[in-house]
Amino acid sequence: MGLSPGAEGEYALRLPRIPPPLPKPASRTASTGPKDQPPALRRSAVPHSGLNSISPLELEESVGFAALVQLPAKQPPPGTLEQGRSIQQGEKAVVSLETTPSQKADWSSIPKPENEGKLIKQAAEGKPRPRPGDLIEIFRIGYEHWAIYVEDDCVVHLAPPSEEFEVGSITSIFSNRAVVKYSRLEDVLHGCSWKVNNKLDGTYLPLPVDKIIQRTKKMVNKIVQYSLIEGNCEHFVNGLRYGVPRSQQVEHALMEGAKAAGAVISAVVDSIKPKPITA
């Protein structure tokens, strides 16, 4: 049975209209021109004047690209660029080891040890720097005190049990004991002058240095018998260095005393001699 044209239009199958596909927007990174030039700006369909004629998306892309183009790239230092090229070509990198004036100033400002500075000052004044095992002669008023150099500006010497008096002083003469002390050379000097004096090296052969130091350190803090004539500070240090306890200071004093005594005896003898009778 057929349908009338009117009925066909009324009961005909109606399909929804599908809009045609829209064109894909151009990619932001796509560019038809050269690599370093910005993409061409598209005009809006609606006529406008000035900036209004550019779409917001196109304006943002163009401004951002212009900003990137206007910022100059940071150039590396010439030396760094040349060094990088030389390394890429297989050459070895050269490291400069020269010190700058600022580095030298920093090193010179480092404080040196106090003892080392004093020894350097003494060497500058022409005084030889003591070596381990050297004998130190200290010039006191009326006598000489002796010590033996050990290390680090320190010496070993004889001192009375009481620190109020020095060995060799009038008070210590009547004491028969002394203690072996390990002290700084500056503390032993008490402002007196001193010198290195190994005067018996030409008479006796010094012991090996390591043996001298070993013997000396074993005596530290020990109490020994003290005698101005037979066991004073010079006897002590000569015994450690040469193995022979000897004191030329006492020998000279005894010799001078013998000479003086001889002169006195000679004068007395001459005075008691009978005088010849003259006519």
From Swiss-Prot:
**Does the entry feature the keyword Acyltransferase, yes or no?**
yes
Keyword list (alphabetical) reads: Acyltransferase, Cytoplasm, Hydrolase, Lipid metabolism, Transferase
Q: Name one GO biological process term.
A: N-acylphosphatidylethanolamine metabolic process
The EC number(s) given in the record are: 2.3.1.-, 3.1.1.32, 3.1.1.4
Q: What reaction does this enzyme carry out catalytically?
A: a 1,2-diacyl-sn-glycero-3-phosphocholine + H2O = a 1-acyl-sn-glycero-3-phosphocholine + a fatty acid + H(+); a 1,2-diacyl-sn-glycero-3-phosphocholine + H2O = a 2-acyl-sn-glycero-3-phosphocholine + a fatty acid + H(+); 1-hexadecanoyl-2-(5Z,8Z,11Z,14Z-eicosatetraenoyl)-sn-glycero-3-phosphocholine + 1,2-di-(9Z-octadecenoyl)-sn-glycero-3-phosphoethanolamine = N-(5Z,8Z,11Z,14Z-eicosatetraenoyl)-1,2-di-(9Z-octadecenoyl)-sn-glycero-3-phosphoethanolamine + 1-hexadecanoyl-sn-glycero-3-phosphocholine + H(+); 1,2-di-(9Z-octadecenoyl)-sn-glycero-3-phosphoethanolamine + 1,2-dihexadecanoyl-sn-glycero-3-phosphocholine = N-hexadecanoyl-1,2-di-(9Z-octadecenoyl)-sn-glycero-3-phosphoethanolamine + 1-hexadecanoyl-sn-glycero-3-phosphocholine + H(+)
Give the location in the cell: Cytoplasm, Cytosol
One term under GO cellular component: cytosol
The molecular function terms in GO held by this entry are: N-acyltransferase activity; phospholipase A1 activity; phospholipase A2 activity
Q: In which tissues is it expressed?
A: Highest expression level in testis and pancreas.
Annotated stretches, region: Disordered: 1-53, 70-117
Which residues fall in a compositionally biased region of kind Polar residues? 97-106
Q: What is annotated as the active site?
A: H145, H157, C233
Domain LRAT, by residue range, is 135-249
**Family classification:** Belongs to the H-rev107 family.
- What role is this protein assigned? Exhibits both phospholipase A1/2 and acyltransferase activities. Shows phospholipase A1 (PLA1) and A2 (PLA2) activity, catalyzing the calcium-independent release of fatty acids from the sn-1 or sn-2 position of glycerophospholipids. Shows N-acyltransferase activity, catalyzing the calcium-independent transfer of a fatty acyl group at the sn-1 position of phosphatidylcholine (PC) and other glycerophospholipids to the primary amine of phosphatidylethanolamine (PE), forming N-acylphosphatidylethanolamine (NAPE), which serves as precursor for N-acylethanolamines (NAEs).
| Protein name listed in UniProt | Phospholipase A and acyltransferase 5
